Amino acid sequence: MTYLTRRTALQAIAATGTSFIGITEALANALSLATSASSNDDEFWFTVRQAYAIDPTIVNLNNGGVAPSPRSVQDALRRATERANEIPAYEMWRNQEPQIETVRQRLATMFGVDQEEIAITRNASEALETVQLGYRLRAGDEVVTTTQDYPRMLTTWEQRERRDGIVVKRVKYPTPLVNSDDFVDAVVSAITPQTKVVHISHIVFLTGQILPVQSICRIARERGILSIVDGAHSFAHIPFRRADLDCDVFATSLHKWLSAPIGTGMLYVRKDLIPSIWPLMAAPKTMDADIRKFEEIGTHPAAVHNAIGDAITFHQ
């Protein structure tokens, strides 16, 4: 994964084939701007801005919670939804549902993993809770996380604390974090022989602090501890792949920085760990080692997850 460049962004916009600025000729002009040494950032980003249908009367400074989808993604979602409503069962299950495999492969390529390690979810919370609630823990087992992790995820661990008698340790660290070694030392010092899980954010949701997750994950691996990384705010935002984190589990919301449809997320689980995690909703025993067991949620709109592919095209 790389940072957005002028050329790749505009090529992606042009490739969508939509009329978001009314004239296709304007796209060709924009492409020439991208390669011109005299073009300035304002011209380029104005063109990118036209790809989005945004209320001009409001300056939206919060794209971290839910980002808008470009018109190309909205159009793809709309067309597929309309088609699914014309012949629902046939279109949804025979035509649209199988396309999730193409999306799975493209996400796996972006993250640098095997497609059999990627599940498509509705958001990062669902993806993380799948593992938080599905991983086998006994009374007395410890989970190490931080006070600055996402509240919903902390609430999930607290529920397991009440329900199963596990122990949740919340590491405090300063904001801003000046020395990454201080963070690593703080987390490692909380680890004991009873620690079974370490759960940390890649980018802190409130501050934007990027944490040294690779160091933590490698230490966890050496000690036989499951490492969970909350990447809700990092995927498609900063350049990295799974190898840069070395985590066992990674989850993100695709409706944030990737600009995929609202209600899309991704879960990565290292292949050999899949059998050890129960899905949130029941799946047959034959799927015990299949990443798709985490997608067994009943009837859902296939058009939504298929439009993730259009978001990837735009992003790249």
Question: What kind of region is each of these model predictions?
Answer:
Residues T2, T8-Q316:
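Pyridoxal 5′-phosphate
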